[in-house]
């Protein structure tokens, strides 16, 4: 695969991770370097691992990936998005009781949801007879960088007084929006 095409593919695959990272930065408002690195590392790792897994799965599972990947991604994003919205309306103080999306189950679910498209890319690269190692490394590194930038952008956006109060609502709505976008792109809505 040529370098410009590989970079374009990596950026395209990282767009969901970037949007989730911005939403996470908005939600947390004060983001430590550790939280940024943890989210970026996991998103990048999953984004690199999924095409490798897809490549090894090859043609045998393509019909399953094509049929169910969008539903899996939607379910994970909708679950976390609705959880964020619920927490936004339950707590008067935005910081009170807020779970950190850069830890635990939420982190793993977000990592899977934002990288599941890369699984299908791996299957496709396998069917084309292309090597997976360089594409997987580039995809993971691009995702890591865009995720780190996205978290910081979200933090800056949340610092503005107009957005600060509604950052968690915005974050949940963004996750739901990405989930519905995935369903729309897969043809669920016709």
UniProtKB/Swiss-Prot annotation:
Q: Which UniProt keywords apply?
A: Cell inner membrane, Cell membrane, Ion transport, Manganese, Membrane, Transmembrane, Transmembrane helix, Transport
Naming one, the record's GO cellular component terms include:
plasma membrane
Molecular function via GO? manganese ion transmembrane transporter activity
The record's subcellular locations are: Cell inner membrane
User: How does the UniProt record describe the way this protein sits in the membrane?
Assistant: Multi-pass membrane protein
Regarding protein family, the annotation reads:
Belongs to the MntP (TC 9.B.29) family.
Function text: Probably functions as a manganese efflux pump.
Q: What protein name does the entry list?
A: Putative manganese efflux pump MntP
Q: Which gene encodes it?
A: mntP
């Amino acid at each position: 695969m040529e370098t410009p095409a590989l970079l374009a593919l990596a950026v395209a695959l990282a767009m969901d991770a970037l949007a989730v990272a911005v939403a996470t930065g908005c939600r947390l408002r004060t983001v430590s370097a550790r939280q940024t690195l943890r989210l970026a590392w996991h998103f990048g790792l999953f984004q690199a691992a999924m095409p490798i897994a897809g490549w090894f799965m090859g043609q045998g599972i393509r019909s399953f990936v094509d049929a169910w990947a969008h539903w899996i991604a939607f379910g994970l994003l909708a679950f976390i998005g609705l959880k964020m919205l619920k927490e936004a309306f339950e707590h008067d103080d935005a910081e009170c009781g807020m779970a950190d999306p850069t830890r635990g189950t939420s982190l793993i679910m977000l990592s899977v949801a934002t990288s599941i498209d890369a699984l299908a890319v791996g299957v496709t690269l396998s069917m084309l007879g292309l090597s997976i190692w360089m594409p997987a490394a580039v995809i993971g590194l691009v995702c890591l960088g865009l995720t780190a930038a996205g978290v910081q952008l979200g933090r800056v956006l949340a610092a503005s007084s107009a957005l600060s109060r509604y950052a968690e609502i915005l974050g949940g709505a963004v996750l739901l929006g990405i989930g519905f976008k995935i369903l729309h792109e897969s043809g669920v809505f016709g």
